[in-house]
Design a protein with these regions (language model features):
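Short beta-strand motif preference
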Residues: 24, 144-146
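Face-selective signature of the C-terminal outer-membrane beta-barrel domain
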Residues: 1-86, 92, 96-98, 153-159, ...
Length: 202
């Protein structure tokens, strides 16, 4: 088996005015999967597809304490085998409020879209089963939190909720020592507390 990918990406940033910044960009990745003949099998299969993306972001600094950021991304594929092409528009929004010079509160709402890779859809070793009908995963993440810098520490506390439809995950069949990637819905709600310590040299 051989997986190959290559692509290009570009983006540009504009300072619209002292309180607003816009970013626009695109990316393209061409993927190729080849199941090459071996001494054990003469099977020769090849698949390819193009992954396209267009995205934009607007950052608005309302005042010294409040900043809002919104973003949009369109993702689509072309050239996929068996007509397995997809298209999705996802959005994101963030609000940042500075409490003081060293601490801030924030709110994030982000939609996600993740295509399955060829290495998840097609076997890359003898233990993996093919999953050619694997679907993209779509989700939404909500997070509200607090950050603070103090004395070489970066403190963070956050409450989050994740809801993903068709989450891509590997299922292991221990009885047959094999695994296969599948889609299953996933939800998770939790609290995250962390402390990042920075040394004198960073």
């Amino acid at each position: 088996e051989k997986n190959t990918s290559y692509g290009v990406d570009a983006q540009r940033t504009w300072e619209i005015h002292p309180r607003a910044t816009a970013v626009v960009g695109m990316d393209l990745v061409h993927e190729i999967y080849a199941k090459l003949p071996t001494s054990a099998s003469r099977e020769d299969k090849r698949y390819a597809r193009n992954n396209w993306g267009l995205f934009g972001q607007w950052e608005q600094r309302f005042d010294a304490r409040n900043t809002g950021i919104i973003g949009l991304r369109e993702t689509w594929t072309t050239g996929a085998a068996r007509g397995q092409n997809y298209s999705n528009l996802s959005a994101s929004a963030q609000w940042l409020h500075k409490l003081d010079a060293k601490s801030s509160a924030y709110l994030n709402i982000t939609q996600s879209f993740v295509m399955p890779t060829f290495s998840q859809m097609y076997p890359k070793n003898d233990m993996q089963k093919a999953a050619p009908d694997l679907k993209p995963q779509k989700g939404i993440n909500y997070e509200i939190g607090w950050k603070a810098n103090h004395g070489g520490h970066t403190w963070k506390a956050a409450l989050f909720h994740v809801n993903i439809k068709d989450n891509i995950t590997a299922k292991v069949n221990t009885g047959r020592t094999e695994y296969q990637y599948t889609n299953e819905d996933f939800r998770n709600t939790g609290i995250e507390v962390s402390d990042e310590i920075r040394g004198k040299d960073g």
